[in-house]
């Protein structure tokens, strides 16, 4: 069926009425009255548990949300994506990052062409190159083994590899991995300064080989290599992830060190492609394939499971409920796993660049809010930074906890138990809160004077009823990481279909790029600032004055 705008509008109205009149108000009471609440509002896929029972929903909420998914034709749009249809309508492209991890022998067609052999060919080339670097068969220009990899990229060419490489640290048995993204010269200077060009491989990740930040940093790195080892050494110390073979050749990188990908892979969905080359070099091709396999398992589940048993669908529906119906403008991603410390930033790009839109697929203004602000930090660090606001602030911010049942350090299992206890405690505290009477009783138990009890007790009250959901898996290994990322990718897709927007373009980044190009000669003093707004003129003048001071 097609998207039913009339039914969709009616269901949204019913959801808003339900939120105002009959959604759970007291979560303590909801759990007390319903011992089966956890069982009804949780799902498992193998060892991965998704619990949303602490969110303010009931059976009526879930029935209406499923009705919403049907009206938005989530299933039809999902089928269109997997079939290679051009669902990215503003760029007239297919959206097939799922093909990058499809290990089946079936066809995946884009405009009548089966892309799976192409995917396999690139993956095999990546594996051969990674094995060569890791084993020392592929050496630097002076014959030394490569000990360090520097990936130069930005956005999707950086955030995914950074996040995955850090997450899979226990599996590193290859060269050390470093990442440069910012145009700020401090980033590349600090990264290269402790390294030796003779044992360093630099990967330049830019599909067009024109991205200004990436290519500026790449030229700096090229000079670093050439000045030390000579111009002829450049080819042995660089590789590229790009489709612009002419530009790569002009840079001095041999074609056998160039790895391509396709326009049906968006940057923020590209860690599964050749963009993941630094990850593969760090952890090895076998572990990288396990990473792909985990994502593929989630793809199959998302494609085949019925709506009410489908983890990405339910995660997306809860996300929509919080954003569009409850009016929560933000969501916090809190992984209780230090190695997932870059996951919030990765999901921030995935979600906000995808669903931060204000027009529908047909170019009309949206009728309600779209994607939320996504942010976060790992636990327990966040508890000592911003959790105060999450518990007692005036804004309600849903939290999404992620924790593993087992850590990688058996001799530190007691610390992992403390980590898990903190995660569950925060989830429970947000839901239960603490009443004024409970605060008084706690203070009275300390034998404080009555006047002091009355003065302090209001400050120790927690409203509770603050929603959170929890994801638990066995252990953060390559398979689990791939599955987790794919879960969030498909969640973003589900929310976008209900919002009625295109999750796969990013026109919002263009205007700033254009103006930066215009302003570069102004900032450098080659052109004047006349014709620009008064604020920009004033800022330029101040910068010029301070640079001369």
UniProtKB/Swiss-Prot annotation:
Keywords: Cytoplasm, Gluconeogenesis, Glycolysis, Isomerase
Record field: catalytic activity: alpha-D-glucose 6-phosphate = beta-D-fructose 6-phosphate
UniProt pathway: Carbohydrate biosynthesis; gluconeogenesis; Carbohydrate degradation; glycolysis; D-glyceraldehyde 3-phosphate and glycerone phosphate from D-glucose: step 2/4
Subcellular location: Cytoplasm
PROSITE patterns the UniProt entry points to: P_GLUCOSE_ISOMERASE_1, P_GLUCOSE_ISOMERASE_2, P_GLUCOSE_ISOMERASE_3
Organism superkingdom: Bacteria
Gene Ontology molecular function, alphabetical: carbohydrate derivative binding; glucose-6-phosphate isomerase activity; monosaccharide binding
Entries under CDD domains matching the protein: SIS_PGI_1, SIS_PGI_2
Gene Ontology CC entries for this record: cytosol
Enzyme Commission number: 5.3.1.9
Keyword Signal: no
Disulfide topology: none
Active site per the UniProt annotation: 353, 384, 513
EC top class, as a word: isomerase
GO biological process: gluconeogenesis; glucose 6-phosphate metabolic process; glycolytic process
Protein family membership: Belongs to the GPI family.
HAMAP family according to UniProt: G6P_isomerase
PANTHER family: GLUCOSE-6-PHOSPHATE ISOMERASE (PTHR11469:SF1)
Cited function: Catalyzes the reversible isomerization of glucose-6-phosphate to fructose-6-phosphate.
Protein name: Glucose-6-phosphate isomerase
Organism: Brucella canis (strain ATCC 23365 / NCTC 10854 / RM-666)
Gene label: pgi
């Amino acid at each position: 069926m097609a998207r039913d705008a009339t039914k969709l509008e009616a269901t949204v109205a019913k959801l808003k009425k339900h939120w105002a009149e009959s959604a759970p108000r007291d979560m303590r009471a909801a759990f007390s009255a319903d011992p089966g609440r956890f069982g009804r509002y949780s799902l498992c896929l193998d060892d991965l548990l998704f619990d949303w029972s602490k969110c303010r929903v009931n059976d009526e909420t879930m029935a209406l949300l499923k009705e919403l998914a049907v009206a938005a034709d989530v299933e039809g749009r999902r089928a269109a994506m997997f079939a290679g249809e051009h669902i990215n309508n503003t760029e007239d492209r297919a959206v097939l990052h799922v093909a990058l991890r499809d290990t089946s022998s079936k066809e995946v067609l884009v405009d009548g062409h089966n892309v799976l052999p192409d995917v396999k060919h690139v993956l095999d080339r990546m594996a051969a190159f990674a094995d060569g670097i890791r084993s020392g068969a592929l050496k630097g220009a002076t014959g030394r083994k490569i000990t360090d990899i520097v990936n130069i990229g930005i956005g999707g060419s950086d955030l995914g590899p950074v996040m995955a490489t850090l997450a899979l640290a226990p599996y590193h048995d290859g060269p050390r991995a470093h990442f440069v993204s910012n145009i700020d010269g401090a980033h590349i200077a600090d990264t290269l300064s402790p390294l030796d060009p003779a044992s360093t491989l630099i990967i330049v990740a830019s599909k067009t080989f024109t991205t200004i930040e990436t290519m500026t940093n790449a030229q700096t790195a090229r000079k670093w290599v050439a000045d030390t080892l000579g111009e002829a050494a450049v080819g042995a110390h660089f590789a590229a992830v790009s489709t612009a073979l002419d530009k790569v050749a002009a840079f001095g990188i041999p074609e056998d060190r160039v790895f391509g990908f396709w326009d049906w892979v968006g940057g923020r969905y590209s860690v599964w492609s050749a963009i993941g080359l630094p990850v593969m070099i760090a952890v090895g091709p076998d572990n990288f394939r396990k990473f792909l396999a985990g994502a593929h398992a989630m793809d199959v589940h998302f494609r085949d499971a019925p709506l009410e048993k489908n983890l990405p669908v339910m995660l997306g529906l809860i996300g929509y409920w919080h954003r569009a119906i409850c009016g929560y403008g933000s969501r916090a991603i809190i992984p209780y796993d230090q190695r997932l410390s870059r996951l919030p930033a990765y999901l921030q790009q995935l979600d906000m660049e995808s669903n931060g839109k204000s027009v529908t697929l047909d170019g009309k203004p949206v009728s309600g809010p779209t994607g939320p602000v996504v942010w976060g930090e790992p636990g327990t660090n966040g508890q000592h930074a911003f959790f105060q606001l999450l518990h007692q602030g005036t804004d309600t911010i849903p939290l999404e906890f992620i924790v593993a049942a087992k850590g990688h350090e058996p001799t530190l299992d007691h610390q992992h138990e403390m980590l898990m206890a903190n995660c569950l405690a925060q989830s429970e505290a947000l839901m239960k809160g603490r009443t004024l009477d409970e605060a008084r009783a706690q203070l009275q138990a300390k034998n404080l004077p009555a006047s002091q009890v009355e003065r302090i007790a209001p400050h120790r009250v927690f409203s509770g009823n603050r929603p959170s959901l929890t994801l638990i898996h066995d252990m953060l290994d390559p398979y689990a990481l791939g599955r987790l990322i794919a879960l969030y990718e498909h969640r973003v897709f589900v929310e976008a279909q209900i919002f009625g927007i295109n999750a796969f373009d990013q026109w919002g980044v263009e205007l700033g790029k254009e103006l930066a190009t215009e302003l570069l000669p102004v900032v450098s003093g080659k052109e004047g600032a006349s014709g620009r707004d008064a604020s920009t003129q004033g800022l330029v003048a101040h910068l010029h004055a301070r640079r001369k001071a």
